[in-house]
Every structure is written in structure tokens, then in C-alpha cells.
Amino acid sequence: MAVPISTVAETKELRGLNLIAAHSHIRGLGVDADSLQPRTSSQGLVGQEKARKAAAVILQMVKEGKIAGRAVLIAGPPSTGKTAIAMGMAQSLGSDVPFTMLAASEIFSMEMSKTEALTQAFRKSIGVRIKEESEIIEGEVVEIQVDRSVTGGNKQGKLTIKTTDMETIYDMGTKMIDSMTKERVMAGDVISIDKSSGKITKLGRSYARSRDYDAMGADTKFVQCPEGELQVRKEIVHTVSLHEIDVINSRTQGFLALFSGDTGEIRSEVRDQINTKVAEWKEEGKAEIIPGVLFIDEVHMLDIECFSYINRALEAELAPIVIMASNRGQARIRGTTYTSPHGLPLDFLDRVVIVSTQPYSGDEIRQILAIRAQEEEIDLSPDALALLTKIGQESNLRYASNIITTSHLLSQKRKAKEVSIDDVQRSYRLFYDPARSVKFVNAYEQRFIGDQGAVNFSAPANGDAMEIS
């Protein structure tokens, strides 16, 4: 007799696309809306009051449209929150103001020239708010009558639609009947019809028809029957970037390239025509230019040609605010033999407003690590948090933040509810920080492969000769 096979189902909760990144705990700059005074700890940011206030002032001018074509450099040692401040600015700007973030190394590509990549980044950071008025028919469908020809000719029909104040009958042609069938419009639906394009939008079911069926799908939405006139004029606002307009006009079916990302190089003639057209729309009051923000991280990785291009691009009529971050002191400018502060050419530094970030204090490191643990849904014991703070001070903040997760995994293995000091100590012994790694390399330098590929296998690990008796 066969033994029955038993199966045990195991389910794991996955986060999907909502993963925890290094700066996912940041919600804004954490400043007062009226006075722009930074709070000690707010919206995920801790400390760096001067840098945050400077960023808030820049942000305020961006929102008011009073500043464009300026360059700001956030300079400071590693692990002092330069990228975090930029992320806070992006969160505070909202979805309407374009914010483009890229690393300097992304500029260098075999498929695209450096100037084209920078041009596209600049154009992505400039928004165009286009206003258009359209006539819309909005109401509740009372009845749909469709007359189909016996010989297979054109279909004709009538649409009875109403608001709380009036009711009207419209004649429908073949295309409108097909659109109604496609959207599955029936009596009792509240719909919106754009007269210029013929687009039908199903807003939901009327509350008056809520008892028509005993069971309905989860996606069924009930709305009130519209009031007033059936035909109303609405102003619709679209916000697009100049780069999106460039891509759409650069080729036939260019809008498909927006989804595939294969934009390629766009000719300067196309951009000039778009600039002229946008300027016309602006004069006619149809469009409004929104200067956004372009953030370039690790800006010292750009070469002298890129800096020369940015110098010229900042003087153009359509230019965003360029915010850069660098952790270099005196460094060589890429593409030259010259050394300059922050790795930027001196003529470019003249045009830059510099915001400095300072190393975090012990208390600020403790608050940041506590926020990170809360974001990752990890409970830390007070002793574990104190040890992590000490590690953050003696090593760096990134390393201390990284071993929070590994300590949590070790605590889960022993079925603990919170991370203890023993878990942090075990993680510290398992994973090296940069200082201990350098010490290890120096101790075993002869056993590592050198620049020329040479390695000394006979060198003892502890420096003493091996004895075999």
C-alpha cells in the first residue's frame, strides 16, 4: 500500500517593488514651512542644520520660479548626508517640479556622446506646464439605443444622459457606439465624454442604481449624479519635460521610445524647433516653463569637456538648477594634469555656490541608526543601539547602518524578538569595516597578487619561518 504524500505549504511575504533603499526613510528636508528653520530631527533627516537651511532656501526659490541656471555644490566628507539632502529636496519638490538624479559615471557611454547625455539630463529637468480647455459632457446614462442595419451598414444610436438638473438625447455615430461598447457603458453609469477627441471615461455607477444587483465586483465605484449643465468647459493641465517633447518629435512613433528608453541622439535642429514652439506657447499663455533640478552625484568623476559644456549650458535661456555633490578635497581634474579643490576647474568653481556638510556627532548618529532600524522594522535593544553608535563613530555611518540588517538576521536564527548586543558583536566580527580591511591587507600584503601579477606563496602568514619536525 502506497504511503500518502503530505505537503506543507510555506508562504513568504515579499515586499515587491517597495524595497528598503539607503535613503528610503527620507520624506523631506525637515524644515519649517514659514521660517525655513531646520528641525533637529524631522522627515528622516538629522543634524546638518546649516546645509538643510541652505537647501530649503534654494528649494523655495525653485518653487517660486525665481532661480534657474545656477549651480550649487554640496561638499563634505563621506557619510555626511550629501545625497540624503538631495533626496530630501526631491521629496519636498513634489511630482510637478522635475527632479533628475544621476551619477557622474552615467554620462560615459559607448552608445551616446557625453554632451548628448548631459543635454538629455538638462532637458529632463525642465518642465512645460501646458494648459488646454476642452468641452466635456458629464452625466448619468439613462438609456442607450442602438439601431443595427440588416444589410450590415453603419450603426446608429441615441444616448440619453442626465444630470440632477437636466436631461438630453444625443445622436451617436458608429465610432461613438464602438467606444461605448469597448468601455462597457450601460444605463446607470456616470460617464465623461471629451467632445474634441471623443474619449469616453467611465467615472463609476450612480448611487441611485446601487441596488440594481445583489453582487458586484470589488472594483465597482459609486459616485453622485453630476449637477448643473451637461456640457461644461474644463481646463486640463499637462506637465511634461522638454526631453519627452524632444523624443516624441525626433522620429516617427517617437512616443514608443519613451517606454523603451532607446532615445538615441537627438538632432539639435529638432530641439531648436521645440524651443521656438515652447516660446510661442509661453507668449500666448498656453504654456508655462518650470525650471527643475538636476542633481549630479560624485561630480568629480566628470572630465574637463563635461565641465566646459555645463558652463555654457548654465548660461542658456532654458536651464535648470544644477546641484552637485563631491567628497573630494584637493583632487586632479579628470582629463587634465591640474589639481583643484573638489576636483572642479577653478573657472567653474567661480559660478558655484558651495554648501558644506559636517561630520555627524555621536547623538546624531544614534538618532539616524534608530530611524534606519524603524524603517527596516527592526527592534534594537538599548545596548545594541549604543554599540552601533560607537561603531558608527569609530568606523563610518554606512557600515553601522549595513550591519543592522545582518544583526537582525542573526537574531532571527535564535528566534529573538529584538537585536541584542551579542548579535551586533557577531556581525562586527563577521563583516570587516574599511579600517580593519586595510589592516588585514597590510598584514598579508605579500600573499596578495600585486600590480604586476606577482605573488609570494612562500611568505609565512605571521612573518615567522615554518618549522617541520
From Swiss-Prot:
Which residues are in coiled coils?
none
Primary localisation category: nucleus
Any GO BP annotation = rRNA processing
What protein family does this chain belong to? Belongs to the RuvB family.
Compartments where found = Nucleus
* GO CC field: Ino80 complex; NuA4 histone acetyltransferase complex; R2TP complex; Swr1 complex
Give the gene symbol.
rvb2
What keywords are assigned to this protein? Activator, ATP-binding, Chromatin regulator, DNA damage, DNA repair, Helicase, Hydrolase, Nucleotide-binding, Nucleus, rRNA processing, Transcription, Transcription regulation
Q: Which Pfam families match?
A: TIP49, TIP49_C
Q: How does it assemble?
A: May form heterododecamers with RVB1. Component of the SWR1 chromatin remodeling complex, the INO80 chromatin remodeling complex, and of the R2TP complex.
Q: What does this protein do?
A: DNA helicase which participates in several chromatin remodeling complexes, including the SWR1 and the INO80 complexes. The SWR1 complex mediates the ATP-dependent exchange of histone H2A for the H2A variant HZT1 leading to transcriptional regulation of selected genes by chromatin remodeling. The INO80 complex remodels chromatin by shifting nucleosomes and is involved in DNA repair. Also involved in pre-rRNA processing.
Q: What is the protein name for this chain?
A: RuvB-like helicase 2
Classification via InterPro entries: AAA+_ATPase, P-loop_NTPase, RuvB-like, RuvB-like_C, RuvBL1/2_DNA/RNA_bd_dom, TIP49_P-loop
Gene Ontology terms for molecular function? 3'-5' DNA helicase activity; 5'-3' DNA helicase activity; ATP binding; ATP hydrolysis activity; DNA helicase activity
Binding of ATP occurs at 76-83
Q: Give the EC number.
A: 3.6.4.12
Q: Which catalysed reactions does the entry list for this protein?
A: ATP + H2O = ADP + phosphate + H(+)
The membrane spanning regions, by residue number, are none
